[in-house]
Amino acid sequence: MAQELETPNGEDSQQILSIPDSGRIVAIDPGTKRLGIAVCDEMQLTTRPLPIIERSSWKELLSRVKLIISDFDAAALVIGLPLNSDGTESKMSAEAREIARKFKLSLEIPVLLQDERVTTYEARRRVWLSDPRARSDELVDSEAARVILEDFLDRKRSLRSKNS
């Protein structure tokens, strides 16, 4: 099971393809102060940001994420993996992998990692375009989770079409 969290993109194609094509997926953008959260619809076509979760104890974090997964009846959890622009591990990569490992041990749904390079930049751009006066880091964190989820869903669709 641990090898699923070791590849540069987080997991192999087979694990991604094992995720059903319907059912909600929750994504997390792990940060040092808070976690951005996003969810997709049942058909995995649209995504939306959810309120952030402030970083606290592991027990509290797990409880909050379990509640979100339960409320949305999520089929999978995707964690953003912060890599450097050249694809190498960043300082935060080990922490993201550890969070994913802990969730994998504690949840009964698949937990996958998704390369999150440039997601914060894209999230800031989107927040600014929607409201140039918006400066909230919380908006950016949840929008980054949304970008991570959209990237994951695009990757999943691409793999499906290649294997059809």
Model segments located where?
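Phosphate- and other anionic-substrate recognition elements at nucleic-acid/protein interfaces
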Residues: 1-28, 32-164
